[in-house]
């Protein structure tokens, strides 16, 4: 994985003059790409790259250039192609000659051969930019699921793009201004974001499954066109349950196996839950067959056993199931235990990684965890997206929550709004703002005619989770891992799994009334029975009261500063009440963000406003 950035301008003098800014942009990507740096400046184009070397360590440097068919193509790319060998063979048969075995070179030749249509052939996670020097045209693309990020901004006669917001903000033409809509996204939807919203004024994120072209004509102004090249489409499911389970098994096995390819050490996350355990078991078999030992990693918290208590969302601790998996696998396992003080301190660094207030200690713990894994491995596999695709969250199966209007993971609008001064929303009605995003997603959901109300609603639930909640988790995983110089791959995000599962009837997914029952039945024999049928438990959080004390002290300290930016938008009385309130049962967001995490989120919000010098406009 890597970091990319660049600028295309109708004025070539602007490109030459902005070289110092490009150096700052490149430096801001150093954590995403600590191994190599490259830059291409010519005429109307500046392309910037920072590399984390994973495949073909010597020959995969970027920007990569190809002269072919009278055109010169320059590529910067962040991602991995999991079908690179097949594409390499196909392109070689068409006469292409390669000098490396890097997937970067495969992608470059694929674009030269097929142009934008190459996207239909790619299986992977990616965000990339190709500059066609003679045609004076930039092509941008993002993977179907949205695993890899890509932000952009139009400024006059220029388009500026980058993997991360911090990199865009290094450019002198992109000040850290946030208007009412951007602030509403942070305060009302955070840590989620409206699809395509870059929060900062006039900054957008290229949506998953989309591509864009920016052309600099000889006469007239540059033109930007954005189009969707992939979306989930409902169709009649052709298979009975037995064939469906067999197909799911094949898809999951293939997705995991493809994503184990690397020229650097590979590890897996292992929580003792279904998803990470499946990935670890498949990877372990692959490694063992080749005489290698898999590295697995688990995260926990000091004294958590002492303070843990079961909830609707977290019914059981992870440790017993991790021990079961350790005995089952041939892997070498590492336990990572985080203390409360380090977890609280890392909240600020997690904002530096995400460039926005995030998921509080759900972010900071992952950041610290990835940092430990990076000491041993450069690549890790993780279980994100299985719950969205197979229907694993409680709100899929709780009829009351499922049928309730609004985002099922964010049912606290009135509670949220009460923390903020009314004027900060600039005339935006909070409930209407949230409703707009919810309704837009339902209107765009593909539902074939003739489905019963339950099946219709489950398509909507799939789309809501896929386009909103899952994107928040993918943002988290990308930013926290890449900030640590660790590439994390997510096999359940294989687009073939999403395409196949979208139209599978709910009665199959909910096989015998079990959450993710289809996945469990499909993977019989891969895991110990007690792990295969373990009730879902989310990413672990700390229950140690020392963490609540630490984040409460941080928020109180911030509130003692009369110039604290948080106090310009939040009500002091509401914050003080939060600091003395009992822990809430209903999460602020998702499954984990109860009172300690809400306090921590306000700490992050204050730090973000201050560190990024956010100007509210």
Regions inferred by a protein language model and the residue ranges of each:
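Adenosyl-5′-phosphate
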Residues: 1-4, 23-24, 72, 93, ...
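Short acidic/histidine-rich active-site segments
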Residues: 377-387, 391-393
């Amino acid at each position: 994985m890597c970091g990319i950035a660049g600028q295309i301008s109708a004025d070539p003098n602007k490109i030459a003059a902005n070289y110092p800014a490009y150096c700052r942009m490149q430096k801001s990507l150093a954590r995403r790409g600590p191994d190599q740096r490259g830059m291409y400046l010519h005429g109307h184009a500046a392309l910037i790259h920072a590399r984390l070397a994973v495949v073909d360590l010597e020959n995969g440097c970027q920007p990569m250039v190809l002269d072919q068919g009278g055109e010169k193509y320059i590529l910067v790319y962040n991602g991995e192609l999991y079908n690179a060998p097949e594409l390499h063979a196909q392109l070689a048969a068409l006469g292409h000659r390669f000098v490396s075995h890097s997937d970067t070179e495969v992608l470059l030749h694929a674009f030269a051969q097929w142009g934008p249509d190459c996207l239909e052939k790619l299986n992977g996670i990616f965000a990339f930019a190709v500059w066609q020097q003679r045609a004076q045209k930039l092509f941008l693309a993002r993977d179907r699921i949205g695993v890899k990020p890509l932000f952009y901004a139009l400024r006059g006669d220029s388009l500026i793009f980058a993997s991360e917001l911090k990199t865009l903000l290094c450019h002198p033409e992109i000040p850290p201004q946030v208007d009412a809509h951007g602030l509403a996204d942070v305060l009302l939807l955070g840590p989620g974001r409206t699809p395509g919203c870059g929060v900062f004024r006039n900054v957008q994120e290229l949506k998953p499954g989309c591509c864009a072209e920016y052309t600099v004509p000889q006469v007239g102004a540059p033109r930007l066109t954005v189009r969707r090249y992939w979306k989930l489409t409902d169709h009649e499911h052709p298979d009975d349950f037995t064939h469906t389970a067999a197909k799911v098994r094949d898809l999951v096995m293939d997705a995991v196996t493809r994503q184990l390819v690397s020229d650097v050490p590979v590890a897996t996350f292992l929580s003792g839950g279904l998803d990470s355990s499946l990935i670890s078991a498949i990877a372990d078999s692959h490694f063992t067959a080749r005489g290698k030992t898999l590295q697995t990693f688990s995260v926990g918290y000091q004294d958590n056993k002492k303070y843990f208590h079961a909830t609707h969302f977290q019914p059981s601790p992870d440790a017993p199931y991790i021990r079961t998996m350790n005995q089952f696998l041939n892997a070498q396992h590492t336990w990572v235990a985080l203390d409360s003080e380090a977890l609280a301190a890392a909240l600020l660094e997690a904002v530096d990684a995400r460039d926005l207030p995030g998921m509080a200690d759900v972010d900071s713990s992952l950041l610290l965890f990835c940092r430990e894994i990076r000491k041993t491995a450069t690549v890790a596999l993780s279980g994100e997206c299985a719950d969205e695709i197979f229907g694993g969250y409680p709100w899929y199966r709780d009829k009351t929550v499922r049928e309730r209007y609004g985002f099922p993971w964010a049912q606290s609008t009135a509670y949220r709004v009460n923390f903020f001064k009314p004027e900060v929303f600039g005339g935006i009605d909070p409930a209407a703002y949230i409703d707009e995003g919810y309704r837009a997603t339902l209107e765009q959901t593909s539902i074939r005619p003739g489905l019963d109300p339950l099946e219709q609603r489950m398509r909507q639930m799939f789309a809501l989770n896929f386009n909103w909640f899952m994107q928040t988790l993918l943002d988290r995983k990308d930013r926290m891992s890449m900030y640590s110089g660790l590439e994390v791959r997510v096999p359940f995000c294989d687009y073939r799994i999403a395409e196949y599962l979208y139209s599978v009837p709910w009665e199959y997914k909910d096989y015998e009334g079990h959450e993710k029952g289809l996945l469990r039945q499909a993977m019989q024999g891969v895991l110990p029975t007690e792990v295969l049928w373990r009730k879902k438990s989310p990413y672990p959080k700390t229950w140690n009261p020392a963490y609540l004390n630490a984040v409460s002290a941080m928020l109180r300290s911030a509130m003692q500063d009369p110039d604290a930016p948080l106090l310009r938008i939040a009500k002091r009385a509401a914050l003080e009440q939060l600091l003395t309130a009992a822990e809430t049962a209903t999460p602020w967001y998702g499954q984990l963000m109860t009172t300690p995490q809400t306090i921590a989120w306000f700490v992050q919000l204050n730090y973000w406003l201050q560190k990024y010098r956010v100007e509210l406009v």
